[in-house]
C-alpha cells in the first residue's frame, strides 16, 4: 500500500537562500536563529533552555540545516543516529509567499511575477475599491495600508465594530486581506465580500485574498479565529495532487491546504485549527487512509502566530510540541509509506519587520525504502513533487528531479 504524508511546517526555513539579498533577507535563518536564541536563554517563556527536537534531529533536520548554512544550529550535534533522508531546497519561484512555496513543492513553480500592492499607505487603487464597495453595497472601508494583522485590529477594530466598515490591508506578499468581526459584521458576510474581492482582483494578478475574522470586545481581547479562509488563484498547471486525483487516488487536505491550491486536486477536506487539532486530525486521517493516498497538512501556526508576530519563544514551544508528537505519526506508517516534512518559505521571528524571509527549506523524507543520509542541495522545491510522482508511478512533472528511484 502506497501512501504519502506531507507535513508542511509553514515558514520553517533553514537558512537564507542564495538570492536572499534581492529580498533584503541576507542572514535570515528561521531554525538557526530560533535555536541560537534558545541556547542563549532568550526564549524561556513557557519553555526553557536549548531547543529540543530529538525526533526531527533523528530525521536529519540539524544536518540539513548545516548543509544549508555551513554550521550546526546551536544546541544540536552531529552525534545522532540519522534514520531519514535529509536535504535542503532552494526556491525557483519568484516570490517568498505561501502559494508559490506550496505549488512548487507540488511540481509547479511560479516563474512569473505576482502583482503586489507596494505602497505602504493608500495601498489599493481607488478604481478597485470603488468596484468592490459598489458590488458589496458598502459605503466605505477602513485601512488601505500595509499592516500586521494583530496591530491593525488594535488600531481599527473598535471603529470597524461601530461603523460596520470592513478593514482592508496588505503586506509585502501578493495578498489582499479583509478583517471583520464575526458577530457584528457576520462570518458569511465576510466570506461573500472576499469572493467579490477575489473576482475584482483578476486583472491585478494577486495571489490570495484572505478572510481574517476576529472576535472580542476591544483592543485588549480582539483575537483572530480559526475561521480564516484563503481565496487563491488556481495553479498555472496540474500539480502532482491533480495527477494523483486524476489517476483515481485520494488527496486529503488537513487545514488550509485546499484553499492554497484553490481546491484543485483535492478529494477530501478536513477543517482543523491550532497545532494540536491539526495534528490530531492528521493522525485520524492516517488511520483510515487507503492505497494511493496523500494526506497533506499545513501547520499554519508556526507562520501566523509566531513567525509574523516575531514570537521566538512561541515558535520554539510549538516546534517542541510538534516534535513530541512525531512518534505517534511514525507509529502509524506502513513499510511502504512515505513521510515528507518541509516548509514553504521562511518567517524568521528574529528578523526585522513582520514579513516572510527568503530561505531554503528542509527536505526530510522517511520510509518507502529510502536510505538514511544526505540528499544534498535540491535546486527546487519541485524535487519533492517529482519524487511523489515517482513514488506513485505517475506521469513525470515538468520540473524537479526525483530523489526516489
UniProtKB/Swiss-Prot annotation:
Cell compartments where the protein resides: Cytoplasm
Gene3D superfamilies cross-referenced by the UniProt entry: Alkaline Phosphatase, subunit A (3.40.720.10), Phosphopentomutase (3.30.70.1250)
Residues reported to bind Mn(2+) 2: 303, 308, 356
UniProt GO MF annotations: magnesium ion binding; manganese ion binding; phosphopentomutase activity
Main location: cytoplasm
Pathway: Carbohydrate degradation; 2-deoxy-D-ribose 1-phosphate degradation; D-glyceraldehyde 3-phosphate and acetaldehyde from 2-deoxy-alpha-D-ribose 1-phosphate: step 1/2
Cofactor(s) required for function per UniProt: Mn(2+)
EC number: 5.4.2.7
Function: Isomerase that catalyzes the conversion of deoxy-ribose 1-phosphate (dRib-1-P) and ribose 1-phosphate (Rib-1-P) to deoxy-ribose 5-phosphate (dRib-5-P) and ribose 5-phosphate (Rib-5-P), respectively.
Similarity remark: Belongs to the phosphopentomutase family.
Protein's UniProt name: Phosphopentomutase
Native source organism of the sequence: Shewanella sediminis (strain HAW-EB3)
Source organism phylogeny: Bacteria, Pseudomonadati, Pseudomonadota, Gammaproteobacteria, Alteromonadales
UniProt gene name: deoB
